[in-house]
Amino acid sequence: MTTYSDKGEKAAAFYCSKMGFEPLAYRGLETGSREVASHVIKQGQIVFVFSSPLNPGNKEMGDHLVKHGDGVKDIAFEVEDCDYIVQKARERGAKVVREPWVEQDRFGKVKFAVLQTYGDTTHTLVEKTGYTGSFLPGFEAPRVKDSLLSKLPNCGLEIIDHVVGNQPDQEMLSASEWYLKNLQFHRFWSVDDTQVHTEYSSLRSIVVTNYEESIKMPINEPAPGRKKSQIQEYVDYNGGAGVQHIALKTQDIITAIRHLRERGAEFLAVPSTYYKQLRENLKSAKVRVKENIDMLEELRILVDYDEKGYLLQIFTKPMQDRPTLFLEV
């Protein structure tokens, strides 16, 4: 997951101190990269890259930052046959931003290619068969180690569960069809505005996934309501379609959120009336929540449930000044 930022080093440090990540790799002037500095961080199997332009002539990154602010530019997929996927995607009409190319260092070779998806977002295909480096060719170990990080509590975030892309009205279907057509994904789940709505706003959503269902990409669009929806607000502030939030999975959300709050991570406020209503609703529900509701209320963790089971979730405040990208645990 690559985010463009005009302060990549500071953004990476923020995610490390507040969200429990650790520095993994670096590329910049010291490593021979004259155009872009990239700071790579990792937690569990989650890898984020924060990239910043190094000179005023970098029009592509400059234009992206002016239009969108700090935000996700690229979602990388590790693949087994980069050439085949690019060939099939091109035959089906996908825009190939960059044809397959190879980079190498003493740890081996890696093949890449880049495809265009919704908005200005791209997917980099990464074929790294046999590569033994800690990240990718051209990157080195972080130059500086923050001694404070080892003193902070572990957060236990493990993998990326899903990545949500928000679209302008009437563009959800074409964005989701792109994945079905070009990457051979299939539809996993969908809802319309009769199913997800409040008195004031609503949304439509289609979730697409790969064959193994290990990658899930919800695609949302706003639906008409009495007030501007969260989806429309995102589209307005982002200057079009883009990644709205990244969901990170943990096996122990109680400990994770307690530790994240101790680190200073900020989450959306939840009124106490939510938990009062939740207790009432659960009395007649078929599902039984094993966690202590008082504990969930203390940490402001939400409960989403139906007759098949439940999940616990919480949303951060926006991770930058614009009310665009946020995280879900």
Q: Which residues make up each language-model segment?
A:
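An N-terminus-focused feature that recognizes amino-terminal "leader" regions
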Residues: 1-142, 162, 169, 296-297, ...
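Short, structured motif recognition centered on aromatic/hydrophobic residues
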Residues: 1-5, 15, 21, 41, ...
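Core segments of cupin and vicinal oxygen chelate
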Residues: 2-47, 91, 100-106, 114-117, ...
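Generic recognition of stable, solvent-exposed alpha-helical segments in well-folded globular domains
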Residues: 6, 10, 36, 70, ...
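Active-site-adjacent "gating/activation" loops or surface patches in catalytic cores
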Residues: 54-55, 212-231
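Active-site-adjacent structural elements in folded domains
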Residues: 58, 145-150, 192-193, 225-233
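Non-heme Fe(II) oxygenase catalytic core, chiefly the N-lobe of the double-stranded beta-helix
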Residues: 126-180, 184
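Long compositionally biased, domain-poor regions of proteins
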Residues: 215-217, 238-319, 325-329
